[in-house]
Amino acid sequence: MTVVAVVIHAGKTFGGGLEELRKVLAEAGHSKPLWYEVRKSREAPKAVRKAVKQGAKLVFVWGGDGMVQRCIDALHGSEVPIAILPAGTGNLLATSLGIPKDVAEATEIGLHGEHRTLDLGVMNGERFAAMAGTGFDAIMVNDTDSDEKEKLGRVAYLRSSLKAMRAKSVRMRIRLDGEVWFRGKASCVLIGNIGTVTGGLEVFADASPSDGELDLGVVTAKNAWQWVRVFSEMAMGRSDESHLIEKGRGKRIDVKLKRKRIYELDGGARPRTRRLKVRIEAGSITICVPTTAAP
């Protein structure tokens, strides 16, 4: 029987919690899976590597996008698939792949679903599966309290998003596949491997995590009113027509900022930097998805 491991972000929960997970796994013949609980998502890679060393052939990841990102960064390039148990707030990757926020159903997908090979983005040496960037999104992620997210869910992002709208734009130069693509001031740079952000807003309509390219968006909104317009255009599916948004696609993205800014990968904030070096890593990770998932 396949050796199964479970890596858990302690404190995160959904459905019947870990008790339900243990029950579902036991009923499927996995009464004693390799079991690891970590207090911080940054501790997850060590647990993942230990699980693989102990023979795990399938790794369940219990947590949100940040937890999944840490585990993916540790498992990339291996043949060991990840099964997502979406216990976070946003769960962007799980949602985009059709993985439900239901313990029994998500576990069933891990045990008996299809194995889909996905691309990953690599930003400053770290891999991400959903979204990464700097500016508005990074400020919002950095300023949202984890306890508030647990209590309020997506509503917790509202306060920090209002603050992010007031942040000053920064001058930058962006190269896309080696050519200068953007030069000027911008308030947000977003790089997507999938198309939808928190709140269900579609940013990149044609994005796919298996097309060998990353989608790039730059927002030049200068104040809260312009940000309201940007979000309205996204909600109406008209972001491609916006004069406040520029979009592109490619395999390599190089962002140089005039001033240091924090950045984020899959909802996890990272230290301030003046340089973002990004590339696509095609077919780098295997994820368990529903058998009806689109190719």
Residue ranges and their predicted role:
Residues 133, 137, 190-204, 269:
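Glycine-rich phosphate/pyrophosphate-binding beta-alpha loops
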Residues 176-178, 208, 218-295:
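ATP/nucleoside-binding phosphotransfer catalytic cores, i.e., glycine-rich phosphate-binding loops
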Residues 1-59, 69, 294:
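ATP/NTP phosphate-donor binding region
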Residues 5, 27-28, 38, 76-81, ...:
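Catalytic core of DAGKc-family lipid kinases
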Residues 10, 62-64, 85-87, 193:
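Glycine-rich beta-strand-to-loop/alpha-helix junction loops that act as flexible
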Residues 148-156, 191, 199, 205-226:
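Gly/Ser/Thr-rich active-site loops/lids in small-molecule metabolic enzymes
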